[in-house]
C-alpha cells in the first residue's frame, strides 16, 4: 500500500491504515464508491492518461482496466473511468437478481495486501442492469459523442440454476447475453468464481464448449456488430486444464481469455493462520496471487501465440508487476485489490509507469 514497494506512504495509505481498516470492508466499499460517483463532475475534465491500445478489434484509451466485481450493477462506469482506467468491466451480472451470500462476506488481509470475498454474485440481475445501460447510452447520445471507456460486461450463473443441468445453465447465460450484449463493447463468460456452488465445474471443456458457443450465438443474434467474447478462468486450474481451455478458445474462435480470477489457495500468506481460518471460505485476490496469475498467463500465451487477446489480472500492485504481465504476453491489464489498497491515484500511476 505504499505505491511502489518500499516508497514513502501516501496520504491515502495513511488514511487506509488509520481509518478504513477499522471499517467494515463492504461498508467502506460502498462509501468509497459513492464518493467516486459524487466526484465525477470534477474528475470528468481530466484527460485519460497513457497510450492507446488496440485489442479485440477495439481501441482502448490505455492498457489498464478495472476488473469485474467493483461496479457490479453499472452505476459508476464513467466516474471510475475518470480515475484513469481505460476500460471498466461491470458485473458479474446474473440472469436473475440475487442478494449474494450472507454477511460478512468481504475481508481484508492487510499483511498480505489481499482481499477474501465470498460475495456470491450479489447483483440487480440482467434486466435491471440492461435498463441502466440503456439509459446511460441514451444520455451519452444526447450529449453527443465523447471519449469513453471501453465497457466490458461480465456474466455469470444464477445461484438458483443447478450446474448439472446444462440446458438450464445455457438458458440462464442466454438471458444475460441477450439483454446485455447490445450495450457491451466486449462480453465475458465467468465460470471461475469460487463463490457460486458448482460454477467452476463449468470450466471443464466438455461443459464449457457448448456454453460458450451458445452465448456466442445469442450475442450475434441481438447485435449488429459482432461483440468480442472472452472467458475468465481460475488460477487453480491444473496446467493441463489451462492449456485445454486455450485449445478450446482457438477451436471455437473465442476472442480472448482473462487470466485469472481469485484463488481458493491460502498458501504462503503472512496473515496468521488462525485469522485466515476464522475468515473461512472465499476467493483470495491481491498480492499473493501474483506468481500463479503470471504463470497462467505465460502458459496461455505460449499456447495461443498471437491469435487471442489475453487480459492479465491478479496481484498487479506495482508498475513492475504491470510490466511483468505485459512482458509475459498480456495485451491488456486489469486490477481490483490494489485499487482498494492504493487509492484513487493508483490507476494513473500505473498507466504512466508502463507508458
UniProtKB/Swiss-Prot annotation:
Topological relation to the membrane, as annotated: Peripheral membrane protein
Binding site for substrate: 72, 117-121, 190, 195, 261-262
Main location: membrane
Cofactor note: Binds 1 FMN per subunit.
Pfam families: DHO_dh
InterPro entries with a match to the protein in the record: Aldolase_TIM, DHO_dehydrogenase, Dihydroorotate_DH_1_2, Dihydroorotate_DH_2, Dihydroorotate_DH_cat, Dihydroorotate_DH_CS
One annotated GO molecular function: dihydroorotate dehydrogenase (quinone) activity
Co-factor requirement: FMN
Sequence positions that bind FMN: 68-72, 92, 154, 190, 232, 260, 286, 315, 336-337
Family matches, as CDD domains: DHOD_2_like
Positions of transmembrane segments: none
Reaction equation(s) it catalyzes: (S)-dihydroorotate + a quinone = orotate + a quinol
Annotated keywords: Cell membrane, Flavoprotein, FMN, Membrane, Oxidoreductase, Pyrimidine biosynthesis
This enzyme's EC code(s): 1.3.5.2
Localization per Swiss-Prot or TrEMBL: Cell membrane
Signal peptide, first to last residue: none
Assembly with partners or alone: Monomer.
The family this protein is said to belong to: Belongs to the dihydroorotate dehydrogenase family. Type 2 subfamily.
Function description: Catalyzes the conversion of dihydroorotate to orotate with quinone as electron acceptor.
Protein name: Dihydroorotate dehydrogenase (quinone)
Amino acid at each position: 500500500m505504499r505505491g511502489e514497494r518500499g516508497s514513502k506512504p501516501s496520504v491515502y495509505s495513511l488514511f487506509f491504515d488509520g481509518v478504513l481498516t477499522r471499517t467494515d470492508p463492504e461498508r467502506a466499499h460502498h462509501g468509497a464508491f459513492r464518493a467516486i460517483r459524487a466526484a465525477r463532475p470534477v474528475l470528468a475534465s481530466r484527460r485519460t492518461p497513457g497510450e492507446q491500445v488496440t485489442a479485440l478489434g477495439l481501441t482502448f484509451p490505455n492498457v489498464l482496466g478495472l476488473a469485474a466485481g467493483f461496479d457490479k450493477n453499472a452505476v459508476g462506469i464513467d466516474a471510475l473511468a475518470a480515475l484513469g482506467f481505460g476500460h471498466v468491466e461491470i458485473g458479474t451480472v446474473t440472469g436473475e437478481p440475487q442478494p449474494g451470500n450472507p454477511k460478512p462476506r468481504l475481508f481484508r488481509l492487510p499483511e498480505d495486501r489481499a482481499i477474501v470475498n465470498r460475495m456470491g454474485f450479489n447483483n440487480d440481475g440482467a434486466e435491471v442492469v440492461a435498463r441502466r445501460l440503456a439509459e446511460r447510452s441514451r444520455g451519452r447520445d444526447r450529449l453527443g459523442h465523447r471519449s469513453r471507456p471501453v465497457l466490458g460486461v461480465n456474466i455469470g450463473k444464477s445461484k438458483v440454476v443447478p450446474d448439472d443441468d446444462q440446458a438450464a445453465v445455457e438458458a440462464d447465460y442466454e438471458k444475460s447475453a441477450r439483454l446485455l450484449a447490445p450495450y457491451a463493447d466486449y462480453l465475458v463468460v465467468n465460470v471461475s468464481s469460487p463463490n457460486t456452488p458448482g460454477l467452476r465445474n463449468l470450466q471443464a471443456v466438455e461443459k464449457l464448449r457448448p456454453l460458450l458457443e451458445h452465448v456466442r450465438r445469442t450475442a450475434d443474434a441481438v447485435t449488429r456488430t459482432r461483440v468480442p467474447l472472452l472467458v475468465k478462468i481460475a488460477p487453480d486450474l491444473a496446467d493441463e486444464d489451462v492449456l485445454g481451455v486455450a485449445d478450446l478458445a482457438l477451436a471455437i474462435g473465442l476472442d480472448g481469455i482473462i487470466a485469472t480470477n481469485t484463488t481458493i489457495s491460502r498458501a504462503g500468506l503472512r496473515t496468521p493462520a488462525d485469522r485466515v481460518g476464522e475468515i473461512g471460505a472465499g476467493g483470495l485476490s491481491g498480492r499473493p496471487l501474483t506468481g500463479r496469475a503470471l504463470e497462467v498467463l505465460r502458459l496461455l500465451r505460449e499456447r495461443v501465440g498471437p491469435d487471442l487477446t489475453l487480459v492479465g489480472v491478479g496481484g498487479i500492485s506495482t508498475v513492475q508487476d504491470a510490466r511483468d504481465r505485459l512482458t509475459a504476453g498480456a495485451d491488456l491489464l486489469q486490477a481490483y485489490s490494489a485499487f482498494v489498497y492504493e487509492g484513487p491515484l493508483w490507476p494513473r500511476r500505473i498507466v504512466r509507469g508502463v507508458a
